[in-house]
Amino acid sequence: VVKEKLFTKMTRKKIIAGNWKMNLVADEAIVLVNAISQLQRTDSAVELMVFPPALYIQSLKHTTLKVGAQNFYPAEKGAFTGELSINQLKDVGASIVLIGHSERRELFFESNSFLKEKVDTAIAHNMPIIFCCGEPLSIRDAGNALEFVTQQLTESLFHLSPAQLVDVTIAYEPIWAIGTGITATVEEAEAMHKGIRNAIQAHYHSSEIAASISILYGGSCNPSNAAELFACPNVDGGLIGGAALDATSFIAIANAF
C-alpha cells in the first residue's frame, strides 16, 4: 500500500502568476522579465510565472520564470483565423495556460462548455492549467456566489480524474471587486477559497485531493495587502494583473509569503 502524501498549506505549491494581458511591446517585455529575474530570491519556495502576449513567449522562454499563454483555441489546427493552438504555443515555449479568465468569459463569451473543451485540449497535450472562476456583483448580492462558482467548476473542470487534476491550479477572481471600487476583504477571499476547496472535496470524495490543489487569489492583489491575503489558510498565491507590470511590485508580492 502506497501511503498518500499529506498536503497542507505548507506543502502546497505557492504560485505568483503575472497576467500581462494586452500590455507591453517586445523590448518592454524583455526589460520587465530581466528585472524580475534579478530581484527574484534564489531561496524562495514561491514559483513565479508570467503570461505575456503570445507574441513574446519565444523571446522570454529562456528566463528563470515559467512562461505561459493567456489564451488558445481548442483544436489541433485548421480554419480558425487569428487563433493559436496548444501545439503552436508549446512550440514557442509556453509551459502553462490560463483558462476561464473573467475577461475571456465576458468579452469573448466563453461559456462553461467551451471552457471544458479548452480544459480537455490542454490536458490531452499535457499542458498545465490555471483555471479561473469567479462571480459578478449581482450573483454575490443575491447570496449565490459559492453556488455560481461551484457550477463553473462542475461544468468545466470537475469531469477530470484525480490524476488529471495534478496539473491544475485554480484562481478565484472576485469579478465584483475588480475595477469597481469595491474591495474584497481578506475574510471574503478566504471564505470563497475555503468554499472552493470544500467543493473539490465534496465532488471527489477526498479531503486529500482538495488539500493538494493550489488556489490563487485573482482580485486586486498588491504589495500592501499580499501578506494578509497569503496568511489565509486556503490562499496559496495570486494571479496578479496591474502589479505584475512592475518588477518591484511583483517581487514584493512574491516576498509576502
What are these regions (language model features)?
Residues 1-2:
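Short hydrophobic transmembrane-like helices used for membrane targeting/insertion
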Residues 5-171, 175-257:
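Active-site loop-to-helix "anion-binding N-cap" substructures in soluble metabolic enzymes
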